[in-house]
Swiss-Prot record:
It is a multi-pass membrane protein. Coiled coil: none annotated. NDH-1 shuttles electrons from NADH, via FMN and iron-sulfur (Fe-S) centers, to quinones in the respiratory chain. The immediate electron acceptor for the enzyme in this species is believed to be ubiquinone. Couples the redox reaction to proton translocation (for every two electrons transferred, four hydrogen ions are translocated across the cytoplasmic membrane), and thus conserves the redox energy in a proton gradient. It comes from the Bacteria. It comes from Rhizobium meliloti (strain 1021) (Ensifer meliloti). It is found in: Cell inner membrane. NDH-1 is composed of 14 different subunits. Subunits NuoA, H, J, K, L, M, N constitute the membrane sector of the complex. This is NADH-quinone oxidoreductase subunit N 2. Belongs to the complex I subunit 2 family. HAMAP family: NDH1_NuoN_1. It holds the Pfam family Proton_antipo_M.
């Protein structure tokens, strides 16, 4: 191996190297920082992510394969990495006051988030099943620990334990599928797997391998029938980690799914039939079960399941438009979901948690401006025009109709109507109920900035959806 080749590999992975190096340095520096200087850890973490973002943008102009065909830096990976950076920085901002209240603002909290970010970055650039596994495990190992970070709370420990056990099972299923693929094709690289379907019928064992890989991946995005961990983990984890897990790891899971599912091997296996069934079941379960939830975080967990189902419809559509619709959906979902979680986090003040929907009764009478922001996020999540959430769903539906999946588009619309009810129910509690007590949100400058930024993103994409769709199309394969 020549020095020039090593240099090319290093250049392709500069953003990952920056975050790993920064996280290691932060881990050491964190032990030297005096208690009460958490701001230093926060801004150092933000600086690391921003530096990685600059490096990523510098790589956006060309395609750089690396590590013997296991890793690539292309526009598709750049798009997803920018979504990860956005979600991570906003999570840092939301964590400042919340971490202080909960007593979790130690350096390892930020370091684990950074290493989870590295795992997601690897997943976005991975073009080999083994490198996908490495990124996947780095991400989930960090989120396992972060889920149980409230060590004195039983539900946090319970959530972490459930997540670890079910996550280990899903990983084993995924690895079994990978081993079958390697045994039957002699490779784990996605592009070389296509050679297995050239000429002749598809081996039934390959179909089984595809099913195992599909099962392992849909667990990571919380899709049916591997959704059972989502409600308990989202409810038990620290709210900032719940917010992070609801957007960033989900986007990373979809990045892998788009790379894997649109491979000729998977397309030849007619796996889209399985994926379509998963999409319908996921959206239906998330929408109907959310109707009876009283806990805000648990409701948002089922909301997350329903949104995952809708995004999977874009995977079923396939093609460049289908890919672009999923990418745009995930970008918009990052803004509106972090926004609504930011509203929940700002309610955490003293002995008031804001995790029960009834806690928001009459909120508009005390804080009309903040209530208006919550209204914006909830309407966007429901897909009500002219918010960004409407266009996220609209472009997925367009991709479905253009590919001839009209029945699936109709099902998606009907289930969206069902899901709109539980969002409007929260709006009614905020605006039409009498307040039970007076409360003051923990509205720090960083939380305020996060709410303002996510609101601007939700409104901005709603006003100029075509521009962001073109960005997603240019970032999609072959764009």
């Amino acid at each position: 191996m020549t020095a020039a080749a090593l240099l090319q590999w290093a250049l392709a992975s500069v953003p990952e190297i920056i975050v790993v190096t920064g996280a290691c340095v932060l881990l050491i520096v964190g032990e030297l920082v005096r208690k009460g200087r958490d701001d230093l850890l926060l801004w150092a973490s933000v600086a690391i992510v921003l530096l990685a973002a600059v490096a990523t943008l510098m790589l956006a102009g060309e395609m750089r394969p690396a590590y013997a065909g296991m890793f690539i830096s292309d526009r598709f990976a750049v798009f997803f990495k920018l979504v990860f950076y956005l979600a991570t920085i906003l999570t840092f901002f939301l964590s400042r006051k919340y971490a202080e209240i909960e007593g979790i603002g130690r350096s390892e909290y930020y370091v684990l988030l950074l290493f989870a970010l590295v795992g997601m970055m690897i997943m976005a650039s991975a073009i080999d099943l083994l490198s996908i596994y490495v990124g996947l495990e780095l991400m989930v190992l960090c989120t396992y620990v972060l889920t149980g970070f409230l060590r004195k709370e039983r539900r946090s420990n319970e959530a972490a334990l459930k997540y670890v056990i079910l996550g280990a099972v899903s990983t084993a299923i995924f690895l079994y599928g990978v081993s079958l693929i390697y045994g039957l094709t002699g490779t784990t690289q996605l592009d070389r797997m296509a050679e297995a379907v050239s000429g002749g019928p598809l081996d039934p064992a390959l179909l089984l391998a595809v099913v195992f890989i599909v099962a392992g991946l849909v667990f990571k995005i919380g899709a049916v029938p591997f959704h059972m961990w989502v409600p308990d983990v989202y409810e038990g984890a620290p709210t900032t980690i719940t917010a992070f897990m609801s957007v960033a790891p989900k986007a990373a899971g979809f990045a892998v799914i788009l790379r894997v599912f649109l491979n000729p091997l998977v397309e030849a296996s007619n796996a889209w039939i399985i994926v379509a069934a998963i999409a319908v079941a996921t959206m239906a379960l998330g929408s109907f079960v959310a109707l009876v939830q009283d806990n805000f975080k648990r409701l948002l967990a089922y909301s997350s399941i329903a949104h995952a189902g809708f995004a999977i419809f874009g995977v079923v559509a396939g093609g460049q438009d289908g890919i672009a619709s999923v990418m745009l959906y995930l970008l918009i979902y990052t803004f509106m979901n972090l926004g609504i979680f930011g509203a929940v986090i700002m309610m955490r003040n003293g002995d008031f948690s804001g995790e029960v929907i009834e806690d928001y009764a009459g909120f508009a009478k005390f804080h009309p401006g903040l209530a208006l922001l919550m209204l914006l996020y909830l309407f966007s999540l429901a897909g009500i025009p002219p918010t960004a959430g409407f266009f996220a769903k609209f472009y997925v539906l367009v991709a479905l109709v253009e590919r001839g999946f009209v029945a699936l588009a109709v099902i998606a619309v009907l289930l969206s109507v069902v899901s709109a009810y539980f969002y409007i129910r929260i709006v009614m509690v905020i605006y039409m109920r009498e307040p039970e007590r007076a409360f003051e949100p923990a509205l720090t400058p960083l939380v305020s900035a996060t709410l303002a930024f996510t609101a601007a993103g939700t409104i901005g994409i709603g006003l100029f959806p075509a521009w962001f769709l073109r960005l997603a199309q240019q970032s999609a394969f072959g764009g």
